[in-house]
Design a protein with these regions (language model features):
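Hydrophobic alpha-helical membrane-insertion signals
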Residues: 1-26
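Anion-binding and metal-coordination hotspots
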Residues: 3, 55, 60, 66, ...
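Helical catalytic core of nucleic-acid polymerases
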Residues: 36-40, 51, 87-94, 102-103
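Basic, short loop/linker segments at the boundary and entry of helix-turn-helix/winged-helix-like folds
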Residues: 18-67
Length: 535
């Protein structure tokens, strides 16, 4: 069955440019037809219980028009409606039928939002198939985009207030001789409400006849209940706020409860303000200049977004990336272990990459199978943790290095220590993490690693440049995590379709990647210079 086809002829003044653009649109419609996205739309169409009444718009052409507008224009709903009236290319796609903005909004909510990942990946797979793209090298990066929320209507997670209120409630229960009704854990509003009800029943307190205002004398039991009820109202409020925030964030906004308070990059780099704004953390996975996967997160950093992004990629492409290169924001032990477990070749920079590359913070310790060695070729002695050297990491091991007084590298090794004159130093390391960092270091410094690092800057940063600058997308228009995710999907799909349309003439996907010269040698970090101590 042909889903995406122009069936209704419309009168358009012919011109050479129109013919070229219409040919591109026909190829774009063929791409959608071959991708299988029509089956998804058909499934939604015939399972929609609200499709009563007169016949609606052609959903396939409506979908094609929305995707085309996101690729070519600043695609707000009213802008798409405007293009359906005045732009010949969009008018050609919708066959002269002009939907209004509410129809477009309902279509996005009913057809695209529930099946956004399926729609996104099936179109991408068809582009990869047509141009025979190599997607073995993948790059992940993120950016923060401002949410559509009132920046003054923010709420902080009331953790401290909740703890203080819990102490007050327990003190009140002690006054009421109910100390056996609670444990050391935080009292829930449900249990506290039951305690108050039982207290009223045992003391014959009529809740409706407790007088308010000055000059009204109350019994001790009535005073206790009145104060306890005030605490109950506050407790319910705090629990509701903590439930909205969840475990992984400390704030939300009243006008968009899924948005989180963040410092945006514009504020950070301009140095004009460090005020918090409502925002979302947008992550994309790019390969061969094609956005293969996207994700919308509430995390303020990129540390914990790496694994969910790769899991999404595996879920919809049935494989993990062969090689992956990311910046130092993703370089932690948990992510390195994940890459080893799933056979992903590690080109992810670690936290001290820039320090080692510049020579300001060089590598001071080297790990081998039997232990750790320092720059002065002293082997570290594994010692137990004590009162002065507390364990900071679950897998950490404490090492002691002796012979520091005659070491010519101590000016670097002890630069950040208070006691620089001692003949020893302690360091806590994770041996397995150090081995994984060494593997990443060797991969990144190899000729293949140099090529991947340069292409990471070209592809991933160029993608964000397309979205933010060329497509003028710097603020999210929808509210709620699911709808925001669908909007980001449409923007990412718009970037891919834009590149697809520009590559149709050449029959080759435009690729600005940098290739390694044949005589390129391995990069070497600067060595640490020895500095003799003054006698």
């Amino acid at each position: 069955m042909n889903y995406f086809s122009i069936k209704r002829p419309i009168f358009i003044v012919p011109s050479e440019k129109c013919s070229v653009e219409f040919e591109k649109i026909d190829k774009f419609m063929i791409l959608l037809e071959k991708s299988g996205v029509g089956k998804i739309i058909e499934y939604v169409k015939y399972n929609d219980k609200n499709c009563k009444g007169r016949r609606g718009y052609n959903p396939y052409n409506l979908f094609a028009a929305i995707i085309y507008c996101f690729a070519k224009f600043n695609a707000t709903l009213r802008d798409i409606e405007d293009k359906c009236i005045f732009d010949l290319r969009v008018l050609y796609i919708v066959e002269g039928c002009i939907p209004d903005h509410s129809t477009l909004g309902n279509f996005i909510n009913n057809y695209i939002v529930p099946y956004q990942y399926e729609i996104f990946t099936c179109i991408n797979k068809q582009i990869i198939k047509e141009f025979n793209l190599d997607i073995s090298n993948c790059y992940v990066d993120g950016t923060k985009i401002e949410a559509n929320a009132n920046k003054y209507k923010f709420v902080w997670k009331p953790t401290k207030f909740h703890n203080k209120l819990d102490i007050k409630i327990k003190d009140l229960l002690n006054e009421m001789d109910l100390e056996k009704t609670y444990t050391n854990d935080l009292i829930s509003s449900y249990n506290y409400n039951l305690i108050l009800k039982k207290y009223c029943f045992d003391n014959n307190i009529d809740v409706n006849n407790i007088s308010n205002g000055r000059g009204k004398k109350l019994a001790k039991e009535q005073k206790n209940y009145k104060k306890g009820y005030e605490y109950l109202i506050k407790l319910v409020e705090y629990e509701e706020k903590e439930k909205i925030c969840g475990e992984n964030r400390n704030s939300y906004f009243k006008t968009d409860k899924d948005a989180t308070a963040m410092v945006l990059k514009e504020d950070y780099y301009s140095k004009l303000s460090h005020d918090f704004h409502a925002g979302y953390n947008i992550q994309v996975l790019v390969s061969s200049l094609l956005i293969l996967m996207y994700g919308v997160f509430q995390d303020r950093t990129d540390f914990n977004t790496f694994i969910p992004m790769n899991n999404l990629y595996y879920k919809y492409y049935n494989k993990y990336p062969k090689n992956e290169c990311d910046d130092a924001g993703y370089g932690n032990y948990k992510n390195y272990k994940y890459m080893r477990e799933h056979s992903i070749k590690n080109y992810v920079k670690f936290q001290n990459w820039e320090g080692e590359a510049s020579g300001k913070n060089p590598q001071l310790f080297y790990t081998f199978n039997d232990g750790v060695i320092c720059l002065n070729t002293n082997i570290g002695e594994q010692v137990p943790f004590d009162y002065y050297h507390r364990k900071r990491n679950k897998d950490g091991v404490l090492y002691k290095f002796n012979g520091c007084s005659d070491c010519n590298y101590s000016y670097k090794c002890k630069a950040k220590l208070k006691n620089k004159d001692e003949d020893y130093r302690y360091i806590e390391l994770i041996p397995d993490y150090e081995l994984l960092k060494e593997e990443a270091r060797n991969n990144l410094l190899s000729p293949k690693g140099i090529e991947i690092r340069i292409n990471r800057s070209i592809q991933i940063e160029g993608t964000f440049g397309q979205i933010k600058n060329n497509m003028n997308y710097d603020r999210i228009r929808r509210r709620g995590l699911e709808k925001v995710s669908a909007e980001i999907m449409l923007m990412c799909l718009g970037v891919n379709i834009r590149r697809y349309l520009s590559s149709i003439d050449e029959n080759k996907f435009k690729n600005n990647c940098w290739n390694t010269p044949e005589n390129l040698s391995k990069e070497i970090f600067p060595y640490v210079k020895q500095k003799k101590k003054k006698v």
